[in-house]
């Protein structure tokens, strides 16, 4: 059934002139009222999803971010196929989603392998940003890992029209933890939600290759430092829920220190 167009609305927000790190960071995420899309998915989620997700009383009523925009919402990690569950829900038009894909890919690459990652840009002019942001294209991509179960879903294309859908379990989780429908929605290691701790302004004027070079540089500038700091925080969150594997990643002193900050 055609879910109909996605109506886009936004949080009133102020983009800080200095887009540095903070524990709460810049909260703004694009809000999408998914019209028939989320409504239809929510109906489909009734049934087996509840037993998979489990009790919801562990979700805090207040949003307090433990570190770098990452907050624990479940004490016991939610598992899919025996592995800690990670879910990225975004939209191709969304500048915050475009910015979040960089640390997400860097962190997840430490636990498995992406295949088919493409390149794309967010939509220029969205959410007050008069520029587009180069980023990864998750639509043609897949991910395999011996430690994690990961799914990426882009629910809207560059024009805000429906693209990919969530399955029942994903919809139940999304609607429960993110009832306003804000994207990017990033559920990490079956236990955490993560928000972007820096502004998309940080990526302004950079090409895809320039951002990739910054992220992989041994002496990164402010852009690479911000992305890598979030990648490390996501890595630590994953390590706390997957048995600290692989040891070559989770045993690194910097990651160990972050794990202690995120421990329940």
Regions found by a protein language model. Give the residues of each.
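Intrinsic-disorder-associated, low-complexity terminal segments enriched in Asp/Asn/His/Tyr and depleted
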Residues: 2, 10-11, 21
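Sec-dependent bacterial lipoprotein signal peptides
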Residues: 15-44
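Intrinsically disordered, low-complexity segments enriched in small/polar residues
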Residues: 8-9, 17, 134
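Conserved redox-active cysteine motifs that mediate thiol-disulfide chemistry
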Residues: 91-102
């Amino acid at each position: 059934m055609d879910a109909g167009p996605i109506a886009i609305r936004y949080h009133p927000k102020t983009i800080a002139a200095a887009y540095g790190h903070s524990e709460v960071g810049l909260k703004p995420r694009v809000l999408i009222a998914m019209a028939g899309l989320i409504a239809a998915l929510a109906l489909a989620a009734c049934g087996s999803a509840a037993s998979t997700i489990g009790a919801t009383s562990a979700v805090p009523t207040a949003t307090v971010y433990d570190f770098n925009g990452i907050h624990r919402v479940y004490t016991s990690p939610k598992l899919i196929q025996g592995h800690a569950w990670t879910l990225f829900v975004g939209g191709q038009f969304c500048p915050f989603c475009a910015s979040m894909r960089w640390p997400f890919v860097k962190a997840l690459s430490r636990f498995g392998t992406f295949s088919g990652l493409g390149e794309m840009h967010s939509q220029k002019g969205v959410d007050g940003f008069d520029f587009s942001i180069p980023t990864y294209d998750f639509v043609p991509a897949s991910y395999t890992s011996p430690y994690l179960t990961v799914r990426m879903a882009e629910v809207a294309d560059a024009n805000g029209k429906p693209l990919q859908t969530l399955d029942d379990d994903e919809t139940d989780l999304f609607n429960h933890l993110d009832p306003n429908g804000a994207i990017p929605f990033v559920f990490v290691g079956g236990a955490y939600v993560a928000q972007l701790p820096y502004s998309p302004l940080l990526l302004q004027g950079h090409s895809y290759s320039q951002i990739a070079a910054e992220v992989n540089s041994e002496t990164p500038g402010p852009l690479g430092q911000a992305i890598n700091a979030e990648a490390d925080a996501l890595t630590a969150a994953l390590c706390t829920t997957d048995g600290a594997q692989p040891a070559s990643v989770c045993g690194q002193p910097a990651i160990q220190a972050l794990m202690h900050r995120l421990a329940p």
